[in-house]
UniProtKB/Swiss-Prot annotation:
The modification Phosphothreonine is found at residue 174. This is Chaperone protein DnaK. Keywords: ATP-binding, Chaperone, Nucleotide-binding, Phosphoprotein, Stress response. Acts as a chaperone. PANTHER family: HEAT SHOCK PROTEIN 70KDA. Coiled coil: none annotated. It comes from Mycoplasmopsis synoviae (strain 53). Induction: By stress conditions e.g. heat shock. It comes from the Bacteria. The lineage of its organism: Bacteria, Bacillati, Mycoplasmatota, Mycoplasmoidales, Metamycoplasmataceae.
Length: 596
């Protein structure tokens, strides 16, 4: 196989899959056990690293077994195993390395490049961690793409007609909904929604809770304090969930689960599908609203959707399929294996990047507005939410004080008009600014979001060309609850926020004009007559009193007096380097500063 091969990897919470594209046809690669999905499990035993099916078989007996590491990606947490502390990236790298190795053996050649998928709501830190895991595994990660987007890519490979597609992706540990527009080989994401803390594992856990309660009632034994027994319950709960997708009732038989005072406990219980659906209905309900939110954000109704694609093994549950059908009014498309479709889409994107496929263009979006904090605590947006990525936006700001040689750029994410109501992503300082009157230095702030959804922010002094850059790396996950809270809060507080913003901007404008009047009086010196000085001092005092009282309506009226008074200084524009219009413009673009 002479052509360059790019692996398409779905690095999942519970299972992972690797695919390739040969010509234009995607192929899922089997692991050494002949399976197309590999458990995302790592175990350590006698100095050996064990990955996949063999590791999963040790979950019950080997305490040095790690599962669901994806939930910790992008955090500072570590896991202890094999008498060592491991970062999430290291464990994920072991899974990736295992898949890379068996792919190379299957293909008969070395492979060094990959496209890896992540949930749509993975933040910068989680995406960076995923890329780093790939690097540790010896892979050059060409692209990080969203799982629902990858699924749509796989679904639409041979589709030439225009259509709107909704992707419902319920995996082992995460849930995503995306709405896409497919036309002439272009895949444009219109909206995304979801929950980073909801997946098939949660359905398993409900069965575990039920089993724990039943065992305590029937056998008088508290399983919750028995780690070994809990691991066995978890395994049997997952099996029961899977079986209930095809059966109306399952028998759960667990011989020798534990030893009680009355002897060995042999569990024999039955669980009906109706009971299972009742105990997990609250989980299913949590997936309904993201569907509605994604449609609303895309400005579409359910009737506008042409195809509904189910992704993730958890979508095999009949209750999930029925809910999606009722909510959207159409039968979901189940023509592609839900466990494999994301990896197939990643492989297709790899084929595009390798030049094997040339009739597909993928356009993803950013989920929330990005901006900076400006003078008065105002949130100034640079990149609005649902902007197609990659994207770059620059805006020029200035200083807020005379002779200021340093500014602090505070990067925020969210939809509120005041910075303090949004999420702080990071901050950095730009130093070495040439001393000058306030409003004179020109500082260009640039936001760049790459194709992987990773954000970089830079600030550059246009005169000295000094520049500082930060890559946003959040230490905490941004959950769907946070996302929706930001959006709802912005809507609910729209009028109040607008009032607060107007107050802040009016005060900033007043303080700026007071400063300019004082400078103008100083510049005039003895040339200014006593009456003008007296009137100016009086107005400045009144203005400052109104600022202190936050009497905004009266303050706005007084501002007009100050501005009219300033017209008496004929040469003010040259001496203070600001006119009324320039002052207004400057104050709209003044960054938050650190005064030295």
């Amino acid at each position: 196989m002479a052509k360059e091969i790019v692996l398409g990897i779905d690095l999942g919470t519970t299972n992972s899959v690797v695919s390739i594209v040969e010509g234009k046809n995607p192929t899922v690669l089997e692991n050494p056990n002949g399976k197309r999905t590999t458990p995302s499990v790592v175990a350590f035993k006698n100095g050996e690293i064990i990955v996949g099916d063999a590791a999963k078989r040790q979950v019950e007996t080997n305490p040095d077994t790690i599962i669901s590491i994806k939930r910790l990606m992008g955090t500072n947490k570590t896991v202890k195993a094999n008498n060592k502390e491991y970062k999430p990236e290291e464990i994920s790298a072991m899974i990736l390395s295992y898949m890379k190795d068996y792919a190379e053996k299957k293909l008969g050649q070395k492979v060094s490049k990959a496209v890896i998928t992540v949930p749509a709501y993975f933040d910068n830190a989680e995406r960076e961690a995923t890329k780093n895991a790939g690097r540790i595994a010896g892979l050059e990660v060409l692209r990080i793409i969203n799982e629902p987007t990858a699924a749509a890519l796989a679904f639409g490979l041979d589709k030439n007609k225009a259509m709107k597609v909704l992707v419902y992706d319920l995996g082992g540990g995460t849930f995503d909904v995306s709405v896409l527009d497919l036309e002439d080989g272009t895949f444009e994401v219109l909206s995304t929604s979801g929950d980073n803390h909801l997946g098939g594992d949660d359905w398993d856990n409900e069965i575990v809770k039920w089993l724990t309660k039943e065992i305590k009632t029937k056998y008088s034994y508290d399983v919750s304090k028995d780690k070994y027994a809990l691991a066995r319950l978890k395994e049997n709960a997952e099996k029961a969930k899977i079986d209930l997708s095809n059966q109306s009732v399952v028998q759960i038989n667990i011989p020798f689960l534990a030893m009680s005072a009355n002897g060995p406990i042999n569990v024999e219980l039955s669980l009906k599908r109706s009971e299972f659906e009742a105990m997990t209905s609250h989980l299913l309900d949590r997936t309904r609203k993201p569907i509605e939110d994604a449609l609303k954000e895309a400005k579409l109704s359910a009737n506008d959707i042409h195809e509904v694609l189910l992704v993730g093994g958890s979508t095999r549950m009949p209750a999930v399929q029925d809910m999606v059908k009722r909510t959207l009014g159409k039968e979901p498309n189940r023509s592609i294996n839900p466990d494999e479709v994301v990896s197939i889409g990643a492989a297709i994107q790899g084929g595009v990047l390798a030049g094997h496929i040339d009739d597909i263009l993928l356009l993803d979006v950013t989920p929330l507005t990005l901006g900076i904090e400006t003078l008065g605590g105002v949130a100034t947006p640079l990149i609005p939410r649902n902007t197609t990525i990659p994207a770059t936006k620059s805006q020029v700001f200035s200083t807020a004080a005379d002779n200021q040689t340093e500014v602090t750029i505070s990067v925020i994410q969210g939809e509120r008009q005041m910075a303090s109501d949004n999420k702080m992503l990071g901050r950095f300082n730009l130093t070495g600014i040439e001393a000058a009157p306030r409003g004179v230095p020109q500082i260009e702030v640039t936001f760049s979001i790459d194709v992987n959804g990773i954000t970089k922010v830079s600030a550059k002094d246009m005169k000295t060309q000094k520049e500082q850059t930060i890559t946003i790396e959040n230490s905490s996950k941004l959950s769907e609850e946070e996302i929706q809270k930001f959006i709802k809060d912005a809507e609910a507080n729209k009028e109040a926020d607008a009032k607060r913003k107007e107050e802040a901007e009016t005060i900033v404008r007043a303080e700026s004009l007071i400063d300019q009047v004082k400078k103008a009086l100083e510049a005039q010196g003895d040339k200014a007559d006593a009456k003008t000085k007296e009137e100016s001092d009086k107005l400045i005092k009144e203005l400052q009193d109104l600022i202190d009282k936050k009497d905004i309506p009266t303050l706005k009226a007084k501002l007009e007096e100050v501005e009219n008074m300033m017209k008496n200084f004929a040469n003010f524009a040259q001496q203070a380097n600001a006119t009324k219009d320039q002052s207004s413009k400057d104050q709209e673009e003044v960054a938050t500063v650190v005064e030295e």
